[in-house]
Amino acid sequence: MNELLHLAPNVWPRNTTRDEVGVVCIAGIPLTQLAQEYGTPLFVIDEDDFRSRCRETAAAFGSGANVHYAAKAFLCSEVARWISEEGLCLDVCTGGELAVALHASFPPERITLHGNNKSVSELTAAVKAGVGHIVVDSMTEIERLDAIAGEAGIVQDVLVRLTVGVEAHTHEFISTAHEDQKFGLSVASGAAMAAVRRVFATDHLRLVGLHSHIGSQIFDVDGFELAAHRVIGLLRDVVGEFGPEKTAQIATVDLGGGLGISYLPSDDPPPIAELAAKLGTIVSDESTAVGLPTPKLVVEPGRAIAGPGTITLYEVGTVKDVDVSATAHRRYVSVDGGMSDNIRTALYGAQYDVRLVSRVSDAPPVPARLVGKHCESGDIIVRDTWVPDDIRPGDLVAVAATGAYCYSLSSRYNMVGRPAVVAVHAGNARLVLRRETVDDLLSLEVR
């Protein structure tokens, strides 16, 4: 079998097929048709894939109320509506994400506001909107939020974000629970307990849970187990100091997100149901060990829901061979996007699966690098891959699993506008975010 024709089901959207002439289709729509209608680069979301992962995650964790979709992975009004319709909650971490959610009429009581440096205006907007929870990240924020809630005449439910000293086995930039970093309050140093005491001393904040997030793209539960042990340990200390009656409302342990996905056919993350069962057992066992009732377990998947069901479609431009030794060369395939729509390879060393999707080729594979159009040597989308030897300008290629942290991390580098985003479902396509134009690029100029 020609491996370059294979579309690994653990990597590509669930509704990916090839038509009778070999063109790759998603939800029954040829990618060539989408490129012709909407242009390239183009993000294509398999709506059924996205929604099915929402439902599977909710079922695995007992209820959509226990699953808070991490908006930072990818958010637009359409996605917010899908999340709402599937019964999940929503985590936002800026006033902008909150504004998008509210624009989509997402129920504010199902929104949680995160962030290590929330401004007064962001906290005020969240309180005014009636968000369900705010995760406080510093003593300064506790004071600010207490004053804002007091001015609004409400008592705001909050969680305290903890730093639990866990080194997740992931990239440094997406590991978030070790001590030397910007998020949370350290359990080991006593800062977390000091924050809990301060919340209890306020008039307008109610502590309802403890939060931890150890990182992203995690495939095993070891880090979660240690994090849960330390979160529950702090909860035990809080109950011991303030008594069971006063602490009865602290009924939630939020272990954050970080559930990994397959970017390559060789990746093998655990099924969500298996992971949920293990996490539930961990929290239950840790609670029993210290004599506490088992709290509600909340998780915050973003990548695990948004990542697998989206591809990025590019048109091939320049193709050139570069000698890498006296006897070998690498095929450099330049496309019409790049690091402005996918910075993850440059930022994290991310790896991807890429395929020729506009036709079938029987040409032998050659080693290749998929690169963008930007004036930057690090503008690499797929560092090491294989392409058919006859790949040529005008071909369409697709990169799989780009639904998380691609559009959301996109930029206007080199004044290249952001791509359009199209959702596909049952043979129909609809535009959910239009392509940025030159007029958009000039819209902020004052003269």
Swiss-Prot record:
Q: Name one GO biological process term.
A: lysine biosynthetic process via diaminopimelate
| Cofactor(s) the protein needs | pyridoxal 5'-phosphate
Task: Describe the outcome of a gene knockout.
Answer: Strains lacking this gene are lysine auxotrophs. They cannot survive in immunocompromised mice.
The residues listed in the UniProt record as binding pyridoxal 5'-phosphate, with positions renumbered to this chain, are: 258, 300-303, 405
Question: Which key words tag this protein in UniProt?
Answer: Amino-acid biosynthesis, Decarboxylase, Disulfide bond, Lyase, Lysine biosynthesis, Pyridoxal phosphate
What are the binding positions for substrate in this chain? 216, 303, 344, 348, 376, 405
Q: Name one GO molecular function term.
A: pyridoxal phosphate binding
Q: Per the similarity annotation, which family is this? A: Belongs to the Orn/Lys/Arg decarboxylase class-II family. LysA subfamily.
Instruction: Spell out the protein name for this chain.
Output: Diaminopimelate decarboxylase
Organism of derivation: Mycobacterium tuberculosis (strain ATCC 25618 / H37Rv)
